[in-house]
């Protein structure tokens, strides 16, 4: 992975992820091949915070059809990043 911005693709904004922000847990969509160490280094480099823990999950592709053509959606990887207690809050919502 060349760049921290190549690893962290975008924040995941759902009702559950917004509620977890009060506990200093932030959810990001990340590159499927990125390891937890690479994700930790990328978050610390981009936002300037300390990461305590990272949980990752890979969502399965779903079968989709467009007319007679069948295919699958892309595989996605999400990372739930827990910050240390003394870290500042991330303000990527604006």
Curated annotation (Swiss-Prot):
Key words, A-Z: Ribonucleoprotein, Ribosomal protein, RNA-binding, rRNA-binding
Q: Any coiled-coil ranges, and where? A: none
Q: Name one GO biological process term.
A: translation
Q: Which domain of life is it from?
A: Bacteria
Q: Which residue ranges does UniProt annotate as crossing the membrane?
A: none
Q: Which Pfam families match?
A: Ribosomal_L23
UniProt cross-references to InterPro entries, sorted A to Z: Nucleotide-bd_a/b_plait_sf, Ribosomal_uL23-like, Ribosomal_uL23/eL15/eS24_sf
Against Gene3D superfamilies, the record matches this protein to:
3.30.70.330
The family annotation for this protein states: Belongs to the universal ribosomal protein uL23 family.
Q: Assembly state and interactors?
A: Part of the 50S ribosomal subunit. Contacts protein L29, and trigger factor when it is bound to the ribosome.
What name is this protein filed under? Large ribosomal subunit protein uL23
Organism classification: Bacteria, Bacillati, Bacillota, Bacilli, Bacillales
Q: Give the gene symbol.
A: rplW
């Amino acid at each position: 992975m060349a760049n921290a911005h190549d690893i962290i693709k975008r924040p995941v904004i759902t009702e559950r992820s917004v509620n977890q922000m009060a506990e200093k847990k932030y959810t990001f969509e990340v590159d499927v091949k990125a390891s937890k160490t690479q994700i930790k280094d990328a978050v610390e480099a981009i936002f300037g915070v300390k990461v305590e823990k990272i949980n990752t999950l890979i969502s399965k592709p779903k079968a989709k059809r467009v007319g007679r053509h069948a295919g699958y959606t892309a595989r996605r990887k999400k990372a739930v990043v827990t910050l240390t207690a003394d870290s500042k809050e991330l303000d990527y919502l604006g």
